[in-house]
Structures are given as C-alpha cells and as structure tokens.
C-alpha cells in the first residue's frame, strides 16, 4: 500500500487543515464542514490517480474522442454524522460510486455519562 501524506507537499489542503485547527474558525460550523468536504474532494481526486482505467471511444459533436474511464467499482463508506461532509466530498468526485453508511451510538452505564458499557 502506498501512503500519500498530503501535508508533506505544498498544496491548498494545508490551508484548509490550518483553518480547521484554528480555535476561532472551528466556531463557524458551516465553514468547518465546507473544509472537510473540500478535503474529501481533494483526497478523492488524488485516489483517482491510482485507479485502473480503460480507453473508450466517446462520440462528440466534432467526432470521436478517446477517453480513459476508470474500471474499478467504488463503494464509499462512512460513519454517520462526523463523516458525512467528508463522504459528500468523495461523492462529488466519484459520482458513480455506491454508498455505505455505519451508524453507532454510545451506551452509557451510569447517570454521569462517563462509563461506556
């Protein structure tokens, strides 16, 4: 498996991460979610470079063009709530992919909600 650490390279994603880590920026939930979505889009684009592709002919108004289409079947899975903006970013790139969702909750065993059981 190849690991691509995006923070090791100069790219716009570093700004999005810095904004998300900023204490004041985190208070604006809309901007925070939008940056999670943007990061999902960027990461999906980077992943798309590693997929398998095949050449296909596409008829255009000007003739026939050869285009490389991905052949991998993709399913995007996420854990509900926190992962949804990230998931949406991936769907913006992999719009023909399947979807999977996982839902979970914490069951507390005491009134103070400090013990999980």
Could you describe each region identified by the protein language model?
Residues 1-117:
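PRPP-associated nucleotide enzymes
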């Amino acid at each position: 498996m190849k690991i691509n650490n995006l923070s090791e390279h100069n790219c716009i994603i570093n700004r999005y991460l810095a904004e998300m880590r900023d204490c004041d920026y985190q208070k604006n939930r809309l901007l925070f979610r939008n940056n999670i979505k943007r990061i999902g889009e960027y990461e999906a684009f980077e992943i798309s470079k590693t997929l398998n592709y095949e050449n296909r002919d596409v008829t255009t108004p000007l003739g026939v063009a050869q285009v490389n289409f991905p052949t991998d079947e993709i399913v995007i899975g996420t854990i509900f709530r926190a992962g949804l903006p990230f998931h949406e970013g991936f769907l913006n790139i992999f719009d023909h992919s399947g979807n999977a969702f996982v839902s979970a909750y914490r069951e507390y065993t005491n009134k103070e909600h400090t013990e999980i059981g």
